[in-house]
Every structure is written in structure tokens, then in C-alpha cells.
């Protein structure tokens, strides 16, 4: 008979496998994105975001090992192709599309790490909650940066902007006791 903790552990592994492969795509895409922008400050900020995505991938990989799991080979292949395709496309798609796409995806990453933190608690792996919440907070900063960049564009008023995430402080406030 499977315990509820085992069910939550398997769900946690699936979320982390998705995050791990998503960070692969993000790393490759941001490598092309920062090279495509002309503004030095934007270039440097996106380079920093790229480095943070690679760090998240390493951290998620370490967590998967701790959970005696590994990445999904199918996801790894698919997301590698996606990231390696999107990166070079940034150079020809203009400034707005990569900023918009990045912001939208970062908004989803926040939730992904919040869900992972909840599943970690429910599966009895409270030792990884802090790391997951920290990654959610970093993703929140990424989303804010790209939202601000998109909103600075003259066409922004014509675009349906993705839902604004709750304030960054809510990431921890909503999860009080998860790491306890």
C-alpha cells in the first residue's frame, strides 16, 4: 500500500523534473537573449538571470539526487531543443518578444517552486523547503524585471500582460511553518 507521503514524494519528483528541464531551456534561451540586446545594463541583467537559472538547475538536480530520482530523459531532450532554438531566435525576433516570453515563463516558475515547497513538506522533506522558497523568490525578481521591461515598451498597452504575482513577501507568508 502506498502512503500519502509516497504519493506527495512522487508528485514532488515530477514537479522537480519539470523544473530541472525548464531551467535547462531557460539557461540556453537566456544565453541567446542577453547576446541579442544592445543596452549594456539589460545585457548584464539578463546574463545574471542566466547564471541564476543554471544555479537553480544545479540545486534542483542535487535535490533530485537526495530524493533518489533523476531527470526525465524525454523532458531533457525536448527542453534542450526548445532552449537551443529560442536562444538564437532572440537575435531575429526583436526586443519585445523575448522579454514578454521570459516574463510569462518566470511568472509560472514562481508557482512551480512554491508548489514544490508544499509537496516537500507534505512528503516529509522539510529540509529542502528553504532552498525551494529561495528559488521562488529569485524567480519573482526575474518576473518583475521582465514585466518592467515589457511595460516600458510603447506597444505594451496593446498586450495582454500575464497575471501579476502576489507580492514577494507572500511567498513566505503563505508558507509559514513549511520549513518548521
At which residue positions do the language-model features occur?
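Non-heme di-metal
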Residues: 1-180
Amino acid at each position: 500500500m502506498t502512503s500519502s507521503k509516497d504519493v506527495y514524494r512522487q508528485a514532488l519528483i515530477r514537479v522537480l523534473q519539470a523544473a530541472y528541464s525548464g531551467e535547462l531551456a531557460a539557461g540556453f534561451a537566456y544565453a541567446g537573449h542577453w547576446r541579442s540586446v544592445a543596452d549594456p545594463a539589460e545585457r548584464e541583467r539578463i546574463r545574471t538571470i542566466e547564471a541564476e537559472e543554471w544555479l537553480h538547475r544545479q540545486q534542483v538536480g542535487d535535490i533530485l539526487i537526495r530524493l533518489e530520482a533523476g531527470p526525465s530523459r524525454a523532458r531533457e531532450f525536448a527542453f534542450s531543443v526548445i532552449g537551443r532554438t529560442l536562444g538564437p531566435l532572440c537575435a531575429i525576433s526583436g526586443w519585445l518578444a523575448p522579454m514578454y516570453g521570459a516574463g510569462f515563463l518566470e511568472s509560472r516558475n514562481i508557482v512551480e517552486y512554491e508548489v514544490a515547497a508544499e509537496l516537500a513538506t507534505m512528503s516529509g522533506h522539510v529540509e529542502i523547503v528553504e532552498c525551494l522558497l529561495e528559488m521562488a523568490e529569485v524567480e519573482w525578481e526575474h518576473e518583475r524585471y521582465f514585466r518592467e521591461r515589457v511595460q516600458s515598451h510603447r506597444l505594451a498597452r496593446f498586450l495582454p500582460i500575464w497575471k501579476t504575482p502576489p507580492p514577494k513577501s507572500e511567498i513566505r507568508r503563505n508558507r509559514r511553518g513549511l520549513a518548521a
